[in-house]
Structure formats: C-alpha cells, structure tokens
C-alpha cells in the first residue's frame, strides 16, 4: 500500500513538474519596422520551439469567431526551431488597426524527417484582449513621436520619460542608441530596457531602434539585429509616417577601428562607406522626395566641431554632404549625454538636436511647423525648438 501511494505521489510530482517546466513565452511580443503594409513581431520562449503569429482585423468580432491566418517564423520555407522568434507580415492596409496573437510549440526532438513536439503556449486572449497596433499611413495629415537615448539600462527613466512625453498619444517611439552600456546576453536586453518598454507600449505602439556605439560592444553585439530590425537588410533603414520621412542611420563606433579598446574586432569605417552608398540612393527615392518633412535619426552627431572624435568626423565627412543636398529638415542625435542644439551653417546645412541622456524629445507636426520639445525626468521643459517647413 505504502509503495503504491509513493508511486502515485511520484507520478503526480512528475506531471506537475513537467507543467511547471513547460514551454512559455518569456519576453515580448513587441513591434518592429511597422510600415504602411507590413509589420514585424518579435518574442522569446524559454525552450527551443517553432513560432507563429495570428492576425485579425479590428472589426468588432470575438477573436475566437473564426480561425485566424497564421504567419510562421521560417527560413527559406522551413520553420525555425529557436527560442527567439520574429515574423514579418506583409500585405497589410495603411492606417489600419490589427489584433494579433503569438504562439510557440516546443520542439522536443528533430531527427532526420521526424519531429516530436511538446506543449504550446500563446498570448492569452480568453481572459484578456489581444494586443492591437496600427499600420503607418503617409496620407495621415500629421504625426507625433517620442525619442530617448543613452538610457544605459536605467530602466526607471524609461517610464518617467515616456510619461512626460505623453507616449500614449504618440504615433511611435524611437530609441536613439546606447540603451545599454554593452551587449553581453539576451537577458540583459530585456532586463536592461525592453521588458519595461514592452510593458509600457512596445506590444502595440511602433518602436523604431537606432543602434548606438555601446550596442556595438560585448560578446553579444553581433546578435543585435536578431532583436531589432530582424527582417530588414541592415540596421539602417528608412520609413514614413504621415508627412514625415525618417532616415535611421547606424553611426557605428566613436573611435578609430584600430583603437586598442576594440581589440581588432571592428570595421566601422567600411561599414559607414557602404551605408553612405545606400543613403545616396534612398534620398533620391519617391518615398523620400514626396515627403513634406525629412528627419534624420543617428546616435553620433556631426557637431559640435571642438574636440570631435573619429565617429563624429565620419558622420560629418560621409553622411552630411549627402544630407545637405537632400534638404534635411533636422537631425536628432544623442551620444554626448548633454543637451545641445546646433543651428545650420555652411558645413551642416540643417539643425542638429542632441538630446541628453535624461531627457525626452516630444515631437509632432502641425501644419508648417515641426515641434521638438525637450523635457527632463521631472517633466520640466528644457527647451522648445521649432523647424519651419521648407
């Protein structure tokens, strides 16, 4: 009898243990690279798994009303077995709300053509509402955004600055680099800033990420694009919302590639050469040319000139000549950990707004004006800056 009881208890413990240690979505989902007709979803599971996202229109129906279309995390037609999942969905309509749900199914083994699956986890849409996002719309009359940079894992400042900028009313949020001091692990990305961002807004509000010079450092640095712009060709890119075309530059490191601090692992001078070639082409594109406003976002500024480091010289030499010809309205930067506004001159023919590490830029268009208000964590207005349409 005692042996039978012990056997039953062991089986119960084993079953409960398997449930407790089952597949689960541990981070995310969050949005990346939302455009007029596409959006990318990123999320993390605790076990190797296949993943997919379901999409549903915001049409008033219950999420369970019909089977929703599925979009799988794949590479060349094969579903990826991974803990990190990303899916880019195309064919969406501009200025349209969509609900979504992400899933993971554990892969217990994959031998030859035989795959054994475990349990499935998904976002809860039974007791809660599925997250909802809105695609961009270049026909939208106005737009708004919030920009922070140089957070360096000060998680509490994210919430303060987002609230100060009234983030719930903004179309998008932009992270302009150095959200961490270096990249050493996946967990660091989430505990350092992304978990808080997901809790606040990133499930439903577009987040656009610009790499800073500190995300280029650490043993996990080459994994950066697995989490940010994971389905794009590069970490530099362009997108439009309302009357604004945004160019997001990756300004690389701030010191020469040969500096001892980099241990011979960097090649940013050539990387910026390639990026300059791309930049020269996109500023001639129809999307760029038809936009009313042109905003460049890059971590390292080309100003001020005094005591300029190598990275700033590179931005000034390789990017600024192209941007001068492209009639840029303003460039938003960080990196210097202080608030500076450089007015246009003969060398840089557009204003450069350098945002401090503990400030947020609250930006919005209004007719012929592009407003940029800078606030600190206490909500104190640091400076108002307005750019007039050209």
What are these regions (language model features)?
Residues 48, 151-154, 179-182, 213-217, ...:
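Solvent-exposed loop/turn segments at secondary-structure junctions
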Residues 1-4:
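Positively charged n-region of N-terminal signal peptides that target proteins for export
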Residues 17-147, 167, 366-390:
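Acidic, histidine-bearing metal-coordination/catalytic regions of metal-dependent phosphoesterases
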Residues 146-149, 172-178, 205-213, 295-299, ...:
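Active-site neighborhood of phospho(di)ester-bond hydrolases with catalytic His/Asp-centered motifs
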Residues 141-219:
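Conserved, compact domain cores that house catalytic/ligand-binding motifs in diverse enzymes
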Residues 7-17:
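Bacterial N-terminal signal peptides
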Residues 103-132, 187-284, 288, 318-322, ...:
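Extended active-site neighborhood of metal-dependent phosphoesterases/phosphodiesterases
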Residues 262-264, 268, 286-331:
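Active-site-proximal segments of metal-dependent phosphoesterases and phosphodiesterases across multiple
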């Amino acid at each position: 009898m005692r042996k039978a009881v012990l056997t039953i208890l062991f089986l119960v413990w084993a079953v409960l243990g398997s449930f407790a240690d089952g597949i689960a979505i541990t981070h995310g989902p969050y949005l990346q690279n939302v455009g007029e007709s596409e959006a990318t979803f990123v999320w993390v599971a605790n076990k190797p798994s296949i993943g997919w996202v379901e999409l549903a229109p915001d049409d008033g129906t219950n999420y369970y009303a019909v089977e929703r279309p599925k979009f799988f995390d794949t590479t060349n037609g094969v579903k990826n077995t991974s803990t990190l999942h990303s899916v880019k969905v195309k064919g969406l309509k501009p200025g349209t709300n969509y609900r979504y749900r992400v899933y993971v199914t554990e892969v217990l083994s994959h031998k030859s053509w035989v795959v054994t699956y475990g349990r499935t986890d998904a976002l809860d849409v039974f007791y809660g509402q599925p997250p909802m996002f809105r695609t961009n719309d270049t026909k939208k009359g106005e737009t708004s955004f919030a920009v922070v940079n140089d957070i360096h894992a000060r998680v509490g400042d994210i919430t303060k600055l987002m609230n100060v900028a009234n983030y719930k009313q903004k179309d998008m949020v932009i992270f302009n680099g150095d959200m961490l001091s270096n990249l050493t692990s996946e967990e660091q990305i989430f505990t350092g800033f992304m978990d808080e961002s997901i809790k606040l807004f990133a499930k439903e509000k577009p987040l656009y990420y610009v790499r800073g010079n500190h995300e280029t450092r650490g043993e996990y640095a080459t994994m950066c694009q697995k989490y940010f712009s994971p389905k794009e060709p590069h970490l530099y890119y362009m997108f439009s919302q309302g009357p604004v075309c945004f160019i997001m530059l990756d300004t690389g490191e701030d010191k020469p590639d040969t500096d001892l601090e980099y241990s011979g692992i960097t090649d940013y001078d050539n990387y910026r050469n390639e990026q300059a070639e791309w930049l020269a082409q996109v500023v001639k594109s129809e999307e760029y040319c038809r936009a009313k406003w042109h905003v460049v976002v890059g971590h390292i500024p080309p100003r001020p000139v005094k005591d300029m480091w190598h990275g700033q010289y590179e931005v000034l030499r390789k990017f600024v000549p192209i941007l001068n010809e492209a009639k840029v309205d303003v460039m938003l930067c960080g990196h210097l950990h202080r608030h500076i506004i450089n007015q246009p001159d003969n060398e840089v023919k557009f204003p450069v707004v350098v945002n401090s590490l503990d400030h947020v830029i609250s930006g919005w268009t209004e007719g012929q004006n592009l407003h940029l208000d800078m606030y600190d964590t206490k909500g104190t207005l640091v400076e108002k800056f307005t750019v007039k349409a050209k």
